[in-house]
UniProtKB/Swiss-Prot annotation:
Pfam families: RNA_pol_Rpb6. It catalyses: RNA(n) + a ribonucleoside 5'-triphosphate = RNA(n+1) + diphosphate. Transmembrane segments: none annotated. Belongs to the RNA polymerase subunit omega family. Keywords: DNA-directed RNA polymerase, Nucleotidyltransferase, Transcription, Transferase. GO terms for molecular function: DNA binding; DNA-directed RNA polymerase activity. GO terms for cellular component: DNA-directed RNA polymerase complex. Its EC number is 2.7.7.6. The gene is rpoZ. Promotes RNA polymerase assembly. Latches the N- and C-terminal regions of the beta' subunit thereby facilitating its interaction with the beta and alpha subunits. The lineage of its organism: Bacteria, Bacillati, Actinomycetota, Actinomycetes, Micrococcales. The RNAP catalytic core consists of 2 alpha, 1 beta, 1 beta' and 1 omega subunit. When a sigma factor is associated with the core the holoenzyme is formed, which can initiate transcription. Gene3D superfamilies: 3.90.940.10. GO terms for biological process: DNA-templated transcription. This is DNA-directed RNA polymerase subunit omega.
Length: 87
């Protein structure tokens, strides 16, 4: 059975900030992933399973997509790789 997440207080923000360069990068990274998770659940209702990737950590449908994204980042299921600068 999936364990329930504790929202934004778990994982701690300090742990999350060690995974990215800045708070801004964390917000953008987590929000983009949360949108993908939200789209995945919307696709489930439409019967399409192959357009988006679902949660990579144990979660339930009741968990907020942003909380799930934060847990994925904290558990190193997602890694932010910077794009190489144009020369």
């Amino acid at each position: 059975m999936a364990t329930s997440t504790n929202g934004i207080i778990d994982p701690p923000i300090d742990d999350l900030l060690s995974k990215v360069e800045s708070k801004y990068a964390l917000v953008i990274f987590a929000s983009k992933r949360a949108r993908q998770i939200n789209d995945y659940y919307a696709d489930l209702h439409e019967g399409s399973l192959f357009d988006n990737v679902g949660p990579l950590v144990d979660s339930s449908v009741d968990d907020k997509p942003l909380s799930v994204a934060m847990h994925e980042i904290n558990e190193d299921r997602l890694v932010l790789k910077p794009i190489a600068a144009a020369e």
